[in-house]
């Protein structure tokens, strides 16, 4: 008989953060945790085929198992290339 585990699912926007606590069966996956959280219904901008996910800042797959106390994170896509932004800042400070 499988026991229950408690997992948090997080999704952060610049203006608002979502943190949902869900109870699942042992052996549940990252995808099951996200679906149980209700965030897919709250935020239509989340697309599990495009958004990357992780557990405590470490990349994870939707099929990975979650454990009691885990925090599943849904990441937003990057809007700009970090390398390009650093290059632009370096050029700007060099021109001062």
Curated annotation (Swiss-Prot):
SUPFAM superfamilies reported for this sequence: MoaD/ThiS (SSF54285)
Underlying gene: rnfH
Taxon lineage: Bacteria, Pseudomonadati, Pseudomonadota, Gammaproteobacteria, Enterobacterales
Protein's name according to its UniProt entry: Protein RnfH
Similarity-based family: Belongs to the UPF0125 (RnfH) family.
Source organism: Shigella flexneri
Annotated Pfam families: Ub-RnfH
């Amino acid at each position: 008989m499988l026991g229950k585990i408690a997992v948090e699912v997080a999704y952060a926007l610049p203006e608002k953060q979502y943190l949902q606590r869900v109870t699942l069966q042992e052996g549940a996956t990252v995808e099951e945790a996200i679906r149980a959280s209700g965030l897919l219904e709250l935020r239509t901008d989340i697309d599990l085929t495009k958004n990357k996910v992780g557990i405590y800042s470490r990349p994870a797959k939707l099929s990975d198992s979650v454990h009691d106390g885990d925090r599943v994170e849904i990441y937003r896509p990057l809007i700009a290339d970090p390398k390009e932004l650093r290059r632009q800042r370096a050029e700007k400070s060099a021109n001062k």
